Structure formats: C-alpha cells, structure tokens
Amino acid sequence: LMVCIAHQYLFLHPDFVFPGQNRLSLVSLKFFTRMTAIGATKKLALSFRKMREVPSERIVVVPPLLRKEVLETTPVNGDYLHGYLLNSGFSEEIRSWHKVHPNVALHIFWDKKEVRPEVKVDSFLSFHQLNDTLFIRYMAGAKAYATTAGFESVCEAMYLGKPVLMVPTHIEQSCNAFDAVQAGAGVVADRFDLDALLELSRTHRPNPAFSHWVKQADWLI
C-alpha cells in the first residue's frame, strides 16, 4: 500500500477553487501532481479547511500537520514584523521599505549561504539564517508575517493567529495563496508590500475554525 501526503493533492479535488491563472499552466500543474502519486492507494490532501472525500480520485482531505513546537507555543502580539524569503534576492525589497519606515522592527529569515547566523543591518532590521526553533519563536511573538506563500509556514502563522502577506513566485504558490486568502490568512501581493501587512495587522481577526481543524489531525490521519 502506498499513501501519498501533500498539500498539492488538493489541486485534484473537484471543489478546489483556482485563481485566474493561464489554463495551460493549471493543466500542467494537475498533470505533474498526478505524476507524483502514480500507484498510490490513497492521497492525503492537506487543506486549510474540511472538504469532502473524493473516492474516485482516492483523495482524503486532512488538516495540516504542524510541528509539535508550534502546537505547544503560546503566541503573543509583539511589535515587529516577521518574514521568510525563499529567495534572498527579495532582501533588497525589504531594505528599501526599511529605509522609508526605519522605526518598524523587522526580523526576516532567509536561505542565504555564507553569511553570519544574524546579519544585523541596524537596531530595527535583522536577517536570520533559517533555524527552526528561532523561526517559531519569532513567529509566535510577531505582529504579522510575510512570506513567498509556501503552505507550511502560512499554516503555522494562521494557527498562531498572525496575519500573513503572501508573495507567490510560481503557480503552485499562487494557488496556495489564493486558497489561504479564502481561509482568512491575509492578503496576496506581487512584492513585499509591508505597508499592506501593517494595515492588515490592525484589522485582522484570526480564524478559530482553522485551529479547531488543525487539532483534529491526530485522529483523522
């Protein structure tokens, strides 16, 4: 028996709503998603919300699998913005915004190699090498979170009640981000528009149904 588990299997669900993307791109996305599950007896599709089973596709929709450290963390509403840059090139956008808003504290994680664990630009802007424990600690104490819209960290932010700015860089992330917005995660932008994130942090209300759904993972999987 082979069971496959991933968020992208939701793209094969007939009720999944896609953003207005190029039709050919969506066909390709679904094709490659199917290819990853050839021979699977069951596809567990990680989702922001409860959805029906699809026996014809062998799809069972399940909650996101969050790390134990996230589930055990007590969030507080801090005064800094937290972020994760999949591509360290985005750091220039962060620096430019910081010059205009020098008094907003920023703790940004990146994948940049050959730099110190913390690159402290000044007392309000720090770039951190990715470190799971530190990342969760900063997430728990942040005002809000900015990311390139990977599924896992968006779920972590939602669980901890943090509004999210998502900047997708490819079609899979665009679909994730669109779905996350429907689930109340936050907003999507084509750049790291931290003004939008600050504004969102003033009005955002966490989605209690999401936390309840996450807590069902143990007995649904």
Regions found by a protein language model. Name each.
Residues 1-4, 137-176:
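A donor-sugar binding/catalytic signature common to diverse glycosyltransferases
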Residues 2-61:
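Active-site-proximal region of nucleotide-activated glycan assembly enzymes
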Residues 7-11, 110-113, 131-133, 169-173, ...:
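Short, acidic/turn-prone active-site loops that include or flank metal/cofactor-
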Residues 12-20, 70-73, 116-121, 139-140, ...:
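Short, charged, surface-exposed secondary-structure boundary motifs
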Residues 35-42, 49-52, 185-221:
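Leloir-type glycosyltransferase catalytic cores
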Residues 63-141:
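Donor-nucleotide binding loops and adjacent catalytic segments primarily
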Residues 119-120, 163-206:
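Nucleotide-sugar donor-binding patch of glycosyltransferase catalytic domains
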